[in-house]
Amino acid sequence: MPMQGAQRKLLGSLNSTPTATSNLGLAANRTGAPCLELPIPDGLFLSLGLVSLVENVLVVAAIAKNRNLHSSMYCFICCLALSDLLVSGSNMLEAGVLATRASVVQQLHNTIDVLTCSSMLCSLCFLGAIAVDRYISIFYALRYHSIMTLPRAQRAVAAIWVASVLSSTLFITYYDHAAVLLCLVVFFLAMLVLMAVLYVHMLAWACQHAQGIIRLHKRQPPAHKGFGLRGAATLTILLGIFFLCWGPFFLRLTLVVFCPQHLTCNCIFKNFKVFLTLIICNTIIDPLIYAFRSQELRRTLKEVLGRGRW
């Protein structure tokens, strides 16, 4: 089912080249202009999606099982895992629907697009929520439990899910407006800036705190420098993974708006599945960064799995 011209759906139809670039792509082939297209085997795509599903299901199951993990922080981590689960699951389902030519199955496309878009928005929102939660736990430590109560966290979670579903419905309905794509790009940049500012501030505070301890105990400065380097490396990895996994997808949305007829942009459009694969990779990495580092959660996972040592 070719999806050229006015893109029929916000996410599903982005797995194609706009009309203007369709003819230009043929011209590029005639002139011999190089165009790098990275093929992603369906088996690899589905395997990554399956790994993401298993990982995030384990996170949700562990948090649901252990009452000690029923806190605002783990509430956001659980919802991040759930949204990541939906991201990978909906993309796998999307791939299956696109591969099926039956008209009845194709009618599910709009529903799947809304699910995919809303789960992506939720995933970004919960990454930001986790950053805010950690920021409050550091800079308002004495009042943290009165500020970030579980009911407040649950209300924030409900608001994020409702806002994401409503926004996704509007985005899918008005998919052919450039403003829709720009809103998504601006939202991604806002989350990136929010996370960068909060984590950089937390790192700066941690370095100052470590320096104060060093002065108090009269230790050697190199220890502080080593701590700062480790913290900077951790921050670089955290934000770098976020940007590398999500950035190409939103770069493509930006190019769809600003250069739909450019040959170079046309080459980028052809790698849509690569960008989705990077997002799936992010849903695999998120549990490793935010969930599996918790000793309590790992202990609960051992009980859930009922075998071996975690």
From Swiss-Prot:
Glycosylation sites: N29
Highest taxon listed in the record's lineage: Eukaryota
InterPro entries given in the database record: GPCR_Rhodpsn (IPR000276), GPCR_Rhodpsn_7TM (IPR017452), Melcrt_ACTH_rcpt (IPR001671), MSH_rcpt (IPR000761)
PROSITE patterns with a match to the protein in the record: G_PROTEIN_RECEP_F1_1, G_PROTEIN_RECEP_F1_2
Compartment(s): Cell membrane
Keywords: Cell membrane, G-protein coupled receptor, Glycoprotein, Membrane, Receptor, Transducer, Transmembrane, Transmembrane helix
Positions of transmembrane segments: 38-63, 73-93, 111-132, 156-175, 184-203, 233-258, 272-292
This protein's record includes keyword Cell membrane: yes
Bilayer topology annotation: Multi-pass membrane protein
Intervals, Cytoplasmic compartment: 64-72, 133-155, 204-232, 293-310
Gene Ontology CC annotations of this record: plasma membrane
Gene Ontology MF terms in the entry: melanocyte-stimulating hormone receptor activity
An example Gene Ontology biological process: adenylate cyclase-activating G protein-coupled receptor signaling pathway
A Pfam family the protein falls into: 7tm_1
Topological domains, Extracellular: 1-37, 94-110, 176-183, 259-271
Xref: SUPFAM superfamilies: Family A G protein-coupled receptor-like (SSF81321)
Alphabetical list of Gene3D superfamilies matching this protein: Rhodopsin 7-helix transmembrane proteins (1.20.1070.10)
Annotated family: Belongs to the G-protein coupled receptor 1 family.
Quaternary structure and interacting proteins, as annotated: Interacts with MGRN1, but does not undergo MGRN1-mediated ubiquitination; this interaction competes with GNAS-binding and thus inhibits agonist-induced cAMP production. Interacts with OPN3; the interaction results in a decrease in MC1R-mediated cAMP signaling and ultimately a decrease in melanin production in melanocytes.
Primary role: Receptor for MSH (alpha, beta and gamma) and ACTH. The activity of this receptor is mediated by G proteins which activate adenylate cyclase. Mediates melanogenesis, the production of eumelanin (black/brown) and phaeomelanin (red/yellow), via regulation of cAMP signaling in melanocytes.
The name this protein goes by in its record: Melanocyte-stimulating hormone receptor
Gene (UniProt): MC1R
